[in-house]
Amino acid sequence: AVDKSKVPWWVSNLIVPLVNLTLALLVSALFIFIAGENPYQAIKLIIYGSFGYIEGFAYTLYYTTNFIFTGLAFAVAFHCRLFNIGGEGQAYIGGLGVFLVAINFSFLPVPIVWILSIAGAFIFGAAWAFIPAYLQAKRGSHIVITTIMFNFIASSLMVYLLVDVIRDMKQMGPHTVALPKELWLPSFKDLAAFFGIKIRYSPLNASFLLAIAASFFVWFLVWKTKWGYEMRAVGHNTHCLLYTSPSPRDPH
């Protein structure tokens, strides 16, 4: 086995992701070739569509934002050696919390509504994650199975709510009432215009910057705080619970 502590940081943070990306492109090229198309042209279009022009790059960052948030949710649990596969469902319910708070407290000043909405996302998402966490700790249910199942439950619940409960009846499709525009986060188009860059419409907004900030926060939490040390210690050795918790319980 390889001692990860002796592996240079640039190997794990640069070389390994680059190798993984290269292998993914090679496998994709193989299947494209089997399908009878030109792998070079297909991959060229993929790269150009993702990074070749500013609107495409903005869409790439827009879709990346969701993966950053759900990836961070997975990473925190993973440091405890727990596999939280329920990031998708927790994001659904967290988004529901944002909407309910924002729509019901829209009369308050915008900064306060933003703060309350973020708190609503925390509470709703954490409450949804608490159920499989409780089943794991108290009943021994496998957290991978329960979190995956809760993704489907959250998806079905959101469909029901969007169609029958919080739907805007003035709309043909399952849409909620639009939040007041003053509550919307600044868009990438507006941010680019501030720096004199003109682009067409893009769904990317300041939530990407929040995702980057959250990444630094999670890094600091895991590696620079006592709580983070306790999480990592528990993940590597459950006996450490005897020293880090007044009421220890084996999370595995």
At which residue positions do the language-model features occur?
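Membrane-interfacial amphipathic/re-entrant helices at transmembrane-helix boundaries
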Residues: 2-69, 111, 116
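Generic alpha-helical transmembrane segments of integral inner-membrane proteins
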Residues: 18, 22, 26, 30, ...
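Single conserved hydrophobic/aromatic residue that forms the stacking wall/gate
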Residues: 243-252
